[in-house]
Amino acid sequence: MKYLRHRRPNATLILAIGAFTLLLFSLLVSPPTCKVQEQPPAIPEALAWPTPPTRPAPAPCHANTSMVTHPDFATQPQHVQNFLLYRHCRHFPLLQDVPPSKCAQPVFLLLVIKSSPSNYVRRELLRRTWGRERKVRGLQLRLLFLVGTASNPHEARKVNRLLELEAQTHGDILQWDFHDSFFNLTLKQVLFLQWQETRCANASFVLNGDDDVFAHTDNMVFYLQDHDPGRHLFVGQLIQNVGPIRAFWSKYYVPEVVTQNERYPPYCGGGGFLLSRFTAAALRRAAHVLDIFPIDDVFLGMCLELEGLKPASHSGIRTSGVRAPSQRLSSFDPCFYRDLLLVHRFLPYEMLLMWDALNQPNLTCGNQTQIY
């Protein structure tokens, strides 16, 4: 009896182990009746874009306090004072960069768009319309947005996160750690030229423009195919025989403490212009030598002048908009834009409507209509 009592618990244990083994085997062989997620879903590839190698942060740039002693400094508006104090600063940390694949293959036309940090809607519309990265006539288009930071620290935290998400999703954001303002647009141009030298110097041509322009990129490619990227090209809406605006209230106010010259060199309106690889290199050389000037399109004209180059006019680039020949006609008629290269300015919804209209296969315009 003792022997039987001693074996009975072991037999029970063996039966229990056998039953558990059969149950486990059936679970492994038979598929589960519902999908069990054993681990979190993988991050989409666009969001898992690898972080670029860290670079040493530039040394902080300190204010040039000697400007405070200038007799006209105290009478200037705050944005002019800020410009004078930090005019010499040219190196800022790059907060968001683009993937190496952006310029890994030959780029025919690089779309370089100056954008304010909070202008998400404009950036998204450009990505969906004329700024979409694609091939036109077999030639590659690439898109970049140049962005700074918001001056308000609370707003900056929000938009910096927004730009981080955009960069991870689209890989088209270049953001530097400086306050994004009208007087800092030249700084954007200088920083981009520095970046391009090492990251995208192979781009044949560049469209440099604002995020509220409408660009007919198909027409641009057709036009640029007749030009050599190794020769000078800088075309837009030509502005000449003008000088600094001394009116205190003007957005373009430039006091004598900034420049005493009364004449600007010829330049193209900053809303949008086209340039070649050759000219981009020339601008880079000149920008390294010249003092930063607060009006970015004028500054680029100064760079061209220093290099012995001239900007040229192109009738298809309208940075001051389009006027219909008659008040009975709408200046928004897509037939006015069919043969143009670029028009400034467009509201976001207008950009989408114009892109849609120009891509309608049944668009009929008849004879060319003159515009102003």
Swiss-Prot record:
Subcellular location: Golgi apparatus membrane
Residues in compartment: Cytoplasmic: 1-10
Glycosylation sites: 64, 184, 202, 362, 367
Biological processes per GO annotation: keratan sulfate proteoglycan biosynthetic process; O-glycan processing; poly-N-acetyllactosamine biosynthetic process; protein O-linked glycosylation
A cellular component annotation (GO) from this entry: plasma membrane
Entry keywords, A to Z: Glycoprotein, Glycosyltransferase, Golgi apparatus, Membrane, Signal-anchor, Transferase, Transmembrane, Transmembrane helix
Pathway(s) where this gene product acts: Protein modification; protein glycosylation
Listed GO MF terms: beta-1,3-galactosyl-O-glycosyl-glycoprotein beta-1,3-N-acetylglucosaminyltransferase activity; N-acetyl-beta-D-glucosaminide beta-(1,3)-galactosyltransferase activity; N-acetyllactosaminide beta-1,3-N-acetylglucosaminyltransferase activity
Catalytic activity: a 3-O-{beta-D-galactosyl-(1->3)-[N-acetyl-beta-D-glucosaminyl-(1->6)]-N-acetyl-alpha-D-galactosaminyl}-L-threonyl-[protein] + UDP-N-acetyl-alpha-D-glucosamine = 3-O-{beta-D-GlcNAc-(1->3)-beta-D-Gal-(1->3)-[beta-D-GlcNAc-(1->6)]-alpha-D-GalNAc}-L-threonyl-[protein] + UDP + H(+); 3-O-{beta-D-galactosyl-(1->3)-[N-acetyl-beta-D-glucosaminyl-(1->6)]-N-acetyl-alpha-D-galactosaminyl}-L-seryl-[protein] + UDP-N-acetyl-alpha-D-glucosamine = 3-O-{beta-D-GlcNAc-(1->3)-beta-D-Gal-(1->3)-[beta-D-GlcNAc-(1->6)]-alpha-D-GalNAc}-L-seryl-[protein] + UDP + H(+); a beta-D-galactosyl-(1->4)-N-acetyl-beta-D-glucosaminyl derivative + UDP-N-acetyl-alpha-D-glucosamine = an N-acetyl-beta-D-glucosaminyl-(1->3)-beta-D-galactosyl-(1->4)-N-acetyl-beta-D-glucosaminyl derivative + UDP + H(+)
Regions that span the bilayer: 11-31
Transmembrane listed as a keyword: yes
Membrane topology (Lumenal): 32-372
Pfam families linked to this entry: Galactosyl_T (PF01762)
Disulfide cysteine pairs (residue numbers): none
EC class (word): transferase
Tissue and organ expression note: Expressed in colon, jejunum, stomach, esophagus, placenta and trachea.
Protein EC: 2.4.1.149, 2.4.1.146
Topology of the protein relative to the lipid bilayer: Single-pass type II membrane protein
InterPro entries in the record: Glyco_trans_31 (IPR002659)
Domain of life: Eukaryota
Similarity comment text for this entry: Belongs to the glycosyltransferase 31 family.
Function of the protein: Beta-1,3-N-acetylglucosaminyltransferase involved in the synthesis of poly-N-acetyllactosamine. Has activity for type 2 oligosaccharides. Also acts as a core1-1,3-N-acetylglucosaminyltransferase (Core1-beta3GlcNAcT) to form the 6-sulfo sialyl Lewis x on extended core1 O-glycans.
The name this protein goes by in its record: N-acetyllactosaminide beta-1,3-N-acetylglucosaminyltransferase 3
Organism: Homo sapiens
Lineage: Eukaryota, Metazoa, Chordata, Craniata, Vertebrata
Gene name of the record: B3GNT3
